[in-house]
Amino acid sequence: MKGALGMSKKVVLAYSGGLDTSIIIPWLKENYGYEVIAMAADLGQGEELEPLNEKAINTGATKIYIEDVKEEFVTEFIWPTLKAGAVYEGKYLLGTSFARPLIAKRLVEIARKEGAEAIAHGATGKGNDQVRFELTVKALAPDLKIVAPWREWDIRSREDAIDYAQARNIPVPVKKDRPYSMDRNLWHLSHEGADLESPWNEPQNDLFMICTPPEQAPDKPEYVEIEFEKGIPVKLNGEALGPVEMIEKLNAIAAAHGVGICDMVENRLVGMKSRGVYETPAGTVLYAAHRELEYLCLDRATMHYKEMVALRYAELVYDGVWYHPLRKAIDAFVDVTQETVTGLVRMKLFKGSVTPAGAKSPYSLYNEEFSTFGRDEVYNQKDAEGFINLFGLPMKVRALMEQKSGLK
């Protein structure tokens, strides 16, 4: 059977083995007659991928690709976002947001290889992920059809989805009495739904799967030293590490101290607010350490402008327009700012908090001879008078005008 473009009637599905994508395989076959090729991206979720080969085939897929993209995930998506200092709405470290463009990119590559006419995903019609998947496909392969079952079928809730799965003897890793929606990768673990849908409900300690609840964390702080080269972390406690290993090791250390828990109500791109609880231990430490190094190495004008750029960068990533020319242009600016962001940062981890405990850099702009409160021989305090007179001249001129005109 051939599609309109002459390709085999195949669809490549972004597959996780979770509830949504487990039921999408039979649904695509029943409603579209597609041959379903599943693709699961190994983003660092570990043992969750082990049973997917058998599960996807048993559910009706003809083939499954399990793609190890961890290295690319860190070097091409996480590090640029870290260097930019991009944080969405002051809290969210974008763990799901920048994973989706990578998954969609790989879907496109497999679709080309297999001669598929369509790509399918399990994102709901209420969320941001549908936008992130589909904008990436539009940017990289505008001719491919996109199938989004949650916008088409009669299933209206996770409970309906569980019923659909059970009717077809499809095992799913959720229970009806606790149907959290979770997304896990090397960078973070997110939790949404169930009792979290009320912002008044405090997350229970048994929710956390990575981080130790802060009140149960060790009573003694732990110090970590992170070395950066041009904004990229390269050593942890003096040990040179690759990008994936850096995050894995720091995750274990920081999570043990309850660092990295984020509970927030965020503004979704599609217009509604949602509540999520995120566990991002390594990311929380790396962002804080990177920022401390920038305090030393960036001048005032560059730092302040970069802060504005970081806000826009975070919006671009969150909104799913990773492949927009503006993000690439901002990357070029950020790379210039990071040329001197090289040095060593010491951070203290204690019961959920991460605080700076020292920083040094060969490119530090902090000069003790100028900054000291003690006696110095390099700064003439009399010079400040002329600076103040010139800097304050516009304010003085306006005040004189207001006095003369009676406005004051």
From Swiss-Prot:
Enzyme Commission number, as recorded: 6.3.4.5
Binding site for L-citrulline: Y92, S97, N128, R132, S181, S190, E266, Y278
Keyword Ligase: yes
Compartments, as annotated in UniProt: Cytoplasm
An example Gene Ontology molecular-function term: argininosuccinate synthase activity
Superkingdom of the source species: Bacteria
A GO biological process held by the record: argininosuccinate metabolic process
Keywords per UniProt: Amino-acid biosynthesis, Arginine biosynthesis, ATP-binding, Cytoplasm, Ligase, Nucleotide-binding
Residues that coordinate or bind ATP: A14, Y15, S16, G17, G18, L19, D20, T21, S22, A41, G122
Subunit structure: Homotetramer.
Pathway membership, UniProt: Amino-acid biosynthesis; L-arginine biosynthesis; L-arginine from L-ornithine and carbamoyl phosphate: step 2/3
NCBIfam families: argG, PRK00509.1
PANTHER family per record: ARGININOSUCCINATE SYNTHASE (PTHR11587:SF2)
Gene3D superfamilies with a match to the protein in the record: Argininosuccinate synthetase, chain A, domain 2, HUPs, Single helix bin
Annotated protein name in UniProt: Argininosuccinate synthase
Family: Belongs to the argininosuccinate synthase family. Type 1 subfamily.
Chief location: cytoplasm
Gene that encodes the chain: argG
Entry GO terms, CC: cytoplasm
HAMAP family assigned: Arg_succ_synth_type1 (MF_00005)
Residue numbers binding L-aspartate: T124, N128, D129
